[in-house]
Amino acid sequence: MISVDTYLQEVLAIAHPLAPLDMPLLDAHNATLSSDVYAGDRLVLRAGRRIRSTHIGLAASIGLDHLPTRPHPRVVVISAGEDLTEPGHTIDERHSYEANSWLLTTAVREAEAIGYRVHTIPDTTEELKDLIEDQLVRADLVVISSGPRSVAMMRESLSALGEMYEREVAMEPSGHHSYGLIGPDRTPVITLPSDSRGAYIAFELFVRPMIRQMLGRKSLTHRTLSATLVGEISGSKEVRSFHEAIISHENEVLRAQPVLANERGEANGLVVIDEQHSALSSGSEVSVILFDRQSE
């Protein structure tokens, strides 16, 4: 079993910044600046910044009509499983609605990448392998979440396409975690747990930093802050536990309120229970990961 931090470093090692290209000013808006920009000897724009309207105006004011940028990564999100049914159709007790690919594709877009969604119900390992292989032509990164009954098929398909590494990560919620390089261009791929809660938390902890590194961003992870816990939460010793929460300021104090399953859509962060504790009581000082996307 490896730690969350070790697993993050392993997946970051396969997510390299994309090759830079010059883009016209309007097209460069919201992209990442790939190199420093000078006006003569004076530095005016620093590499690694997200290009905003003020940067565009500054570039134009010094006579530039293009800026050096990193393109937005193309991320293909694949969901596979015979037990998964697309929303809008009737299901029985043997099936569940396919939600992960919708959740993950929109999370990819929130992370400033280009997201493509693919859902499939493969009959054979070869069929699934062919589908994944066909997607590589438009992918800088592949993210896969399969139904519980399709994990073995996904494992075999990916292993036939390249080098895959399976890891047991000391975290909860957890599930099947693996990553690798597949296809002729050694495209990075990462698999996420089948449970939607575990898949989303794993996305924020691992996939989002991969995307930001491919964008050339300096800051890869969400901010970690201290907050006062409102309510009680529990976890398991020797693993790091993550609980969705609403993080808010009240009387100049940062508070973290864990949410119930039906309130997950309101969560804007995670409360973290470290490996040395199995429970935290109300009023405890806790570490929180804040999903502060607007300021990034």
Where are these predicted regions, by residue range?
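Short, conserved clusters of charged catalytic residues that mark active-site
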Residues: 54, 127, 224, 228
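Alpha-helical scaffold segments in soluble metabolic enzymes
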Residues: 6, 10-13, 43-46, 58-61, ...
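Structured N-terminal alpha/beta-domain signature
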Residues: 28, 32-45, 78, 143-152, ...
